[in-house]
Amino acid sequence: MASLKLTLGVFAIALVGVWVPAPASAQNSPYVIAASDAASALPGATVTANDVDESITTIKKRVDEVNVLFIATDRHGKFVRNLNQTDFSIFDDHKPVESILNFRRETDLPIELGLLMDVSGSVQGRFGFEKDAATGFLQHIIRPGYDRAFVVGFNKESRVTQDFTDKMPLLAAGVQRLNNGGGTALYDAIYKACKDKLLHDQFDHPVRKAIVILSDGEDNQSETTRAQAIEMAQRAEVLIYAISTDDSGLILRGDKVLEDLASATGGRAFFPYKMKDITRSFAAIEDELRSQYDVAYKPSGFDADGRYHSIEITALKKDLQVRARRGYYAPRQ
């Protein structure tokens, strides 16, 4: 198979500071149901982030350095964990980058995670099981003293039921306080979570930021557009993972929305049909968050123009697939 070329993306921000190696991984106890292979993702449409809020503040550190986390898999979908810097090339706005400044595998980087659960009336069928599975996921992935998470329930409005914490009893209580009913403002929830919780430069060490969404993807209340939600996630360097709550077995409009949100930010969407597949989806997300690579590079002829820039990563190994963000927004000076 010819080498694969994917258009990906990152937000222009350097991960700087001293990283202290993590303690041993959290307990290996299973979730509600033992984890196995994740459900397959659906192909999604591409959305261009235009006409967005120009008042958004871009985080600036070293302006000429771009940093991206990415996943590599083989043709069977299994993670490839032995890549070298010579196994891929990077293009920024279709031009070869000037230099690669850093490349390493990130397995224990601290996680800052947002759990966003759709509590609208359309998702009530499996809501109780989903809350239990989400609680199991948080218990398994959050390492006290190292990782943190927050919990948000959204219908026509978003409500934080538990702010950032590493304490599992508080997170579990935050999930159990969620009650469903009402319309759905998915894009507003993503935008607000990224802007209020994950955008600001509040971390004094490298972290990986992610949002896990449980929803059917049907938005009927948001003032924010999908493009604006995607841009805010890209500016905040947030990976979006989505687990569909639709159990019809059909490919619906909401499924394509979830796929697009995930692929635009370097995450992944899952479409579990059976309840046990929800648990498997959570397990796959955890595995992926522990199987990423981090590369930092200097673009050729970098210009702090505030524009959106695309990234292309060309895998040089046969049958290798790479997944990351579609693009980033340069700082403006």
Give the residues covered by each predicted segment.
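Bacterial N-terminal signal peptides
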Residues: 9-19
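Sec/Tat signal peptide C-region and signal peptidase I cleavage site
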Residues: 19-26
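Scaffold/interface architecture of coatomer-like assemblies
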Residues: 26-333
